[in-house]
Amino acid sequence: MAKAKEVKAKPIKGEEAEKLVYEYLRKTNRPYSATDVSANLKNVVSKQVAQKALEQLRDTGLIHGKLYGKQSVFVCLQDDLAAATPEELAEMEKQIQELKDEVSVVKTLYKEKCIELQALNNSLSPAEIREKIQSIDKEIEETSSKLESLRNGTVKQISKEAMQKTDKNYDFAKKGFSNRKKMFYDLWHLITDSLENPKQLWEKLGFETEGPIDLN
């Protein structure tokens, strides 16, 4: 038995085509080009007729169109957008672009923090940082004691050059301590960011501070 031939729908154009294209966009609520619309409607509306219908619908404010490269893409406006003025639509696009820019900044910041964390992980472990801090604390304490004795004249006087060198060494050690201390706390906050009680871990590890700090 011969297979029945498929009856092709008669191509349409004009207002009938515009109505069909609009109903299709409204129903699917997705962005399409003229080529997509023509193909999805089984060529009942040709590509050229679809393009003309889409442009007409855009000009009347029923749909929104935007050029991407060499191809225009159209999407049906929702009820609240259909009533929007060109100025309001422009403001919406501006806000969307600002949000995209903010997302880009956050992504860049996230990558930078990941690199910093990786660098910290590759340099010193928490135990090594603690040991370094203790060593620097001891060095500063000894240097401070010697410097205080020199300033009070309780030991044999030394030359001005030697005093300046001692002050320079002290400042260098103090700066090194501050830098390592900051690096340690940065690492601490990165590691404990997801913990509910960082202070409990701090006490368990036996860390000490010179004064009150925010461990959370």
UniProtKB/Swiss-Prot annotation:
It is found in: Nucleus. InterPro entries: Hop2_WH_dom (IPR010776), WH-like_DNA-bd_sf (IPR036388). Keywords: DNA recombination, Meiosis, Nucleus. GO terms for molecular function: double-stranded DNA binding; recombinase activator activity. Its main location: nucleus. Interacts with mcp7. Required for proper homologous pairing and efficient cross-over and intragenic recombination during meiosis. Acts indirectly in a process facilitating homologous recombination. Acts during mid- to late-horse-tail period. This is Homologous-pairing protein 2. It comes from Schizosaccharomyces pombe (strain 972 / ATCC 24843) (Fission yeast). The lineage of its organism: Eukaryota, Fungi, Dikarya, Ascomycota, Taphrinomycotina.
